[in-house]
Design a protein with these regions (language model features):
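Conserved catalytic region of serine esterases and O-acyltransferases that act on ester linkages
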Residues: 3-195
Length: 195
């Protein structure tokens, strides 16, 4: 691991030596590193800006353009991926304001979200536990994909693009527990949307 890290740092220094921002003429023009960075950030995005203003939708941070029917997703998952945040040494659980289907209300194993937006991400919990099942994601009654929490078989947060459109429109998103997994758990950690 240390050899790889050293090689990466050596490569970084080589690239810095040959890049435009570190050349002598930049310093002769009186540009500081901050000025060069500001100039670079003012340009057009290299890949695009479709998801530049993604906002979180969860139990706590609602959205006036969204109507939610929880169905059987009325529990809150407390076993979450945790990370160090804001220079704190103790870990903080990610997405604590979630919707969990606990496998007990098999007659209402559907979560429905009506939302007006351009793009929508589903953020769901990945897990290696055997009591966790998959869910089908439908948009306006059309199947989009199956959200399978066993993709990585570890405690992670998965983000999946549900739809991305040019103009905002009203959509009905249903997250339905797979028929064979009705007695298993599934956690919607939240949604990312672009108005």
């Amino acid at each position: 691991g240390h050899t790889i890290m050293a090689d990466c740092l050596e490569y970084l220094l080589e690239v810095c030596d040959t890049s435009d921002h570190a050349r002598v003429d930049s310093f002769q023009m009186g540009m500081t590193e901050e000025g060069i960075l500001e100039q670079c950030l003012c340009g057009e995005p290299v890949i695009g800006s479709s998801f530049e203003k993604v906002k979180l939708l969860d139990r706590r941070d609602g959205f006036y353009g969204a109507d939610i029917v929880e169905g059987g997703f009325d529990a809150t998952d407390r076993e979450l991926q945790s990370v160090e945040m804001d220079q704190e040494l103790c870990v903080t659980p990610e997405f604590p304001y979630n919707w969990m289907y606990d496998g007990k209300k098999t007659d209402c194993a559907v979560f429905e979200l009506k939302i007006t937006c351009r793009s929508l991400f589903l953020i769901y919990k990945d897990s290696g536990e055997v009591d966790v099942g998959a869910a089908d994601v439908l948009v306006d009654g059309v199947f989009r994909f199956r959200a399978d929490p066993h993709v990585n078989n570890g405690l992670h947060c998965n983000a999946a693009l549900v739809f991305a459109e040019e103009e905002a429109a009203r959509h009905t998103v249903c997250i339905r527990i797979a028929e064979e997994d009705l007695d298993k758990k599934f956690t919607i950690l939240g949604f990312g949307y672009v108005e």
